[in-house]
Amino acid sequence: MSKKRVLTGVTTTGIPHLGNYVGAIRPAVRAAQNPDTESFLFLADYHGIIKCHEPEMIHQSTQAVAATWLACGLDPERTTFYRQSDIPEVMELNWILTCITAKGLMNRAHAYKAAVQANAENGQEDPDFGVEMGLYSYPILMTADILMFNAHEVPVGRDQIQHVEMARDIAGRFNHRFRELFTLPEVKIDENVELLVGLDGRKMSKSYGNTIPLWENDKKTQKSVNKIITNMKEPGEPKKPDESPLFEIYKAFSTPSETAEFTKMLADGLAWGEAKKLLAAKINAELAEPRERYNELTADPSQIEEILQAGAQKARKEARELLGKVRDAVGIRPLK
């Protein structure tokens, strides 16, 4: 039986934080160890420049994201790990798919519709004011990313289901018009994946400014944890898990029995300050080895580059083969 192919893309527009680790990185690394799965993971740097126009941020983020996944246990021998911009075949496929994609489909993309709505609310006469073609057409590039390797499943959040549905639509259109070359990808939503709460109780997100950095040292992690909001209950007063985001973060780094014990300690009057020390210790214990590996990789980025180039070589071998069939199907052939 052939293996199920799973593809994941990570945009290079920021430095990963604890929420990224719990919600995406840790579960994806574990899933990649499944012997029945063939995993593809890529750094989506071309997607990054759609919204981020700071070259240094794109560059630094590419290094940080790659180092993060490797430090957290991604095995480049088991997972095809590459940088999007190292696979020129993706961009050629992107153009071919652009030529068969209905404009109406792009008009329905959530990001574009949100931009148009914002213009209307701001009184702009031009509904497309400020809309660049990268934002408008990026679902086609995302489709090329997926179809280039005929992924069976694409793990996404609920807000990105539309992207995979569009990829299915475009793949089906190509298959019908030219030749059956593309697998119709399926959405993969893991209901068990945790969305980590931030310092203020909302979803941990850099846009909220409520994150806990992933790669700080033990002392700085403790300082970050100390910022988690709590109520004014004194030491000795019983406390409930829902009275602070601290409990949910602790739960993400603990076994069920440890979580139960922590719940009892809170009920018995554990001081918030002591609870924060226990949480920081949990985080630091789990991340001790990954932090050491991360520092090694970022101190010598050529190690990262070597791994990415090896992944690109592996990916391009397959991409060239499929693109050759796509070119032939649309009539781009050698003259004989």
From Swiss-Prot:
BP-aspect Gene Ontology terms: tryptophanyl-tRNA aminoacylation
Primary enzyme class: ligase
Motif ('KMSKS' region): 203-207
Family: Belongs to the class-I aminoacyl-tRNA synthetase family.
An MF annotation (GO) of this entry: tryptophan-tRNA ligase activity
Residue sites binding L-tryptophan per the record: 145
Protein name: Tryptophan--tRNA ligase
Chain segments annotated as coiled-coil in the UniProt record: none
SUPFAM superfamilies: Nucleotidylyl transferase
EC assignment: 6.1.1.2
UniProt keywords, alphabetically: Aminoacyl-tRNA synthetase, ATP-binding, Cytoplasm, Ligase, Nucleotide-binding, Protein biosynthesis
Its biological purpose: Catalyzes the attachment of tryptophan to tRNA(Trp).
Gene Ontology CC annotations of this record: cytosol
Positions of short motif 'HIGH' region: 12-20
Organism encoding this protein: Neisseria meningitidis serogroup A / serotype 4A (strain DSM 15465 / Z2491)
